[in-house]
Amino acid sequence: RRASCQTAGCGTVGVGLAMERIRMLTQAEALEAAGFGWYEVSNWSKPGGECRHNLLYWRDGQWWGAGPGAHSFIGRERFANVKRPERYADTLRGGDLPIGFTETVTDAEHHDEQVMLGLRLKEGIPAGWVGEGARGVVDKHVRGGLLTAGERIAVTDAGRLLADGIVTDILAAE
């Protein structure tokens, strides 16, 4: 399998996007030859070497961030500490939490984030996460070889290059 203008779809997309696809396909060939496999759209590892930190985000986990500028996501609350170390330390010394930003994630936002981040993973998402209105879109992408669907919906190797557009199609149809 060699990356080429034909495999990148030069005839159907602009040259810039085709060149990006060629770059990604060339990288994929080199990484696969070295024993790496993709586990997220733009992340590769040898078996067992996946980044647990990033998987937490993509799998809808929760986390506490410590230190200046650190971000946290607990329950449905997303917040970030103040960025400047001096202000962070002064706030703590004053007995307050150094939170510089906070937001509550709505059910709809949470759902969209689960689909968006989960479909970036090779393991995909539970089929139940996709609304009934988007089933036709999923079926279209399965027929096009970009998704697999069963108990889980996941991008294929070919779909990996188009994951953002696939997610947009699915969420727009729900």
Region roles according to the model:
Residues 158-174:
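Short, amphipathic alpha-helical interaction segments positioned at domain boundaries
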Residues 142-152:
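A short, conserved structural fragment
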Residues 1-131:
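C-terminal scaffold of the Radical SAM
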Residues 63, 153-154:
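Hydrophobic residues embedded in beta-strands of well-ordered beta-sheets
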